[in-house]
Amino acid sequence: MRDQDFRVGRREDAGRVVITVAGEIDLGTAPRLRDALDDALTCGVHRVEVDFSGVRFCDCSGLGVLLRARAQARDAGVVFGVAQVQAPVVGRLFHLTQTASALGVSGRAA
């Protein structure tokens, strides 16, 4: 995967940050997602949602970033969730690792 195909965006409204992700999350791109989540979790909001509607692939490094962010959110009293998982391979990752519930994975829009 080419890193330039990977995008992370951010929007904020009413005490909530939505991190939008597009492309493939792997060892090369996971640090960019980690940085975006770190910023979101330290800006004083009550809720952080990660919109996965544009994510085509996520490996264990991406999963690790999400689990780390979830732990940070819990410690800070911030609600954390992953929304709009569209790619079957990503849904399988959450299912096989039994992390969907812990990550607050939902099919609804962020």
Indicate where each model-derived feature is located.
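STAS-like cytosolic regulatory interaction modules
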Residues: 1-56, 61, 67-110
